[in-house]
């Protein structure tokens, strides 16, 4: 425990005391007004009641904030909005949007200064670089194949928002700012129920989006900080035998002796022998913990995480939120894919002098399969096909122009291919493309009271071009001089697009 506390104190950021005075600067709220709420209209914003608010209200609001009686009355009478000097309710809407946005911008300053305060000669830790979403796909393609067990974790979130405020006390020691944050959270009674909703932690209200995102990211940063400590403690040397182990002990002692005589000379060489038992990647409120070792060791990891949330974050996590599976015998849901790591046999032909023999080599390969049943269910719900996948027309779109109908169907098809381009078996994607293309043809034929064949002959190649995906367009440019070129067999390799992590729901382009 002492080692953990020392590690925690060593890596904590510098405490900040200057945050609260910035809350009374006008430009902070002007910045929140211009960039946080409505980028297209920097001068004024429009509320849900079609009422416009000018940035001039910022100065009046800051003047009221200097008055102590205003804050006392607001706390004593939370149901009565003391910002309302007028009967039209301008300040109530403005207060609920601009002030939390400005507060979020101010409290983000210490975290941004921590990044710029690092000396140039100091290398950024690799673990921080791997927090990007770009690390997800190399993780699956490379390290994932050499691991044995998988823990699929649904990252919990605090039941009470006071826990989030307490987490900020480790990094921001500006007491007035923390009290003001508590005032915001208590003022809006629906915030606590909103953030603990089981639907999604990412679906924030527009006016509170920045503040909630900051609170949630600060919680994730603190959770991953402790997880990094456990990960470093679980590292071990990759051993081949007991003899190798003894040799490496002697070698490590020699390296330590040389490290004392020549400090910093062999530092990078020692890290070469470190082999973490656990690999971690996070996405969309979930996390994957893939590790080596036995089933018992991975169950201990599960209880490590449960105790971590219980003792350091003061809330209980249900054990069922952490699913432990063996990679060789199970599949898991990942970003809309059904993924698994089966063992496949590779037949290798070897020849030594005049002798020819075959060797069976077992190797692991990541399979990412498109969930056909779920996607066909989405298309059926959107009235593009029946439950069994039979294409039908969409009568609600018959009032649109022909090119609008083609554009909508083509955009849906391209979005599906774009999202699931990392699939190792794309037969399901071509089936979905067939359903959308025939549904489009039937919709157009129904609009013009004609047959499908007649209408497709009238459109010709323009009808097919609307359903070309990004992969097909790129490959068609690369192989323009090739006479025999087939889209179906030319790009079986998986293609990962880094922007698919932003797509939360595939049903959105279907509506």
Curated annotation (Swiss-Prot):
Job of this protein: Usually encoded in the trnK tRNA gene intron. Probably assists in splicing its own and other chloroplast group II introns.
Species assigned in the record: Phalaris arundinacea
Pfam (any one): Intron_maturas2
Full protein name: Maturase K
The family this protein is said to belong to: Belongs to the intron maturase 2 family. MatK subfamily.
Keywords: Chloroplast, mRNA processing, Plastid, RNA-binding, tRNA processing
GO molecular function, one term: RNA binding
Main location as per UniProt: plastid
Organism domain of life: Eukaryota
Record bears the keyword Ion transport: no
Entry's Gene Ontology BP terms: mRNA processing; RNA splicing; tRNA processing
This protein's record includes keyword Plastid: yes
Cellular component aspect of the GO annotation: chloroplast
Cellular compartments annotated: Plastid, Chloroplast
